[in-house]
Amino acid sequence: MIKSSAIHSPFEAPNTISLVAGTGDANNPLNAFDMSLLKSGIGNLNLIRISSIMPPKADIIPLPKIPQGSLVPTAYGYQISEIKGETVAAGISVAIPKDKELCGLIMEYECIGGKKECEDTVRNMAKEGFEMRGWEIDEIISIASEHTVENIGCAFAAAALWYK
């Protein structure tokens, strides 16, 4: 259970990571994006967009109850379309190293297309990132969302970092 009174230094590395995804459709792009955040469970948080590094030894957990309005470090991808009938997708992957002293990699990807294509691509991006570093992968975890546009649609996927 996260305590609302817990205060963390902005320089303290988070020690948990949660993968979430959602979709939304609305009358304008911002509300479609907001609906996708709400459906992913992080719509009432202040997301601070980060680059794609998972702190060493961070645990991957289901999304905890985070106090509304909290500043949450988040890596995310999203795709918005205004073309009715078009399919959009967004995915996120986390590659965990065999050497637990090393950081992990978070990769995000979005596309006009389906969930499988998106998730396959984002997993391959994580593999390539590890190859570039010369590191061995222990595990890759991923999630993706897909949405067929009715009005203005958004697919969203994120890795939200937080504290135990």
UniProtKB/Swiss-Prot annotation:
Cofactor(s) this protein requires: pyruvate
Cofactor: binding details: Binds 1 pyruvoyl group covalently per subunit.
A Pfam family this chain is assigned to: PvlArgDC
Reactions mediated catalytically: L-arginine + H(+) = agmatine + CO2
GO MF annotation, one: arginine decarboxylase activity
Pyruvic acid (Ser) modification, residue list: S52
Keyword Iron-sulfur on entry: no
Keyword Zinc included in the entry's annotation: no
Keywords, in A-Z order: Decarboxylase, Lyase, Pyruvate
Xref: InterPro entries: Pyr-dep_his/arg-deCO2ase, Pyr-dep_his/arg-deCO2ase_sand, Pyruvoyl-dep_arg_deCO2ase
EC number annotated for this UniProt entry: 4.1.1.19
Superkingdom: Archaea
Sites marked Cleavage (non-hydrolytic): S51, S52
NCBIfam families for this protein: pyruvoyl-dependent arginine decarboxylase (TIGR00286)
Family indicated by similarity: Belongs to the PdaD family.
Record-given protein name: Pyruvoyl-dependent arginine decarboxylase
UniProt source species: Methanococcus maripaludis (strain DSM 14266 / JCM 13030 / NBRC 101832 / S2 / LL)
Organism classification: Archaea, Methanobacteriati, Methanobacteriota, Methanomada group, Methanococci
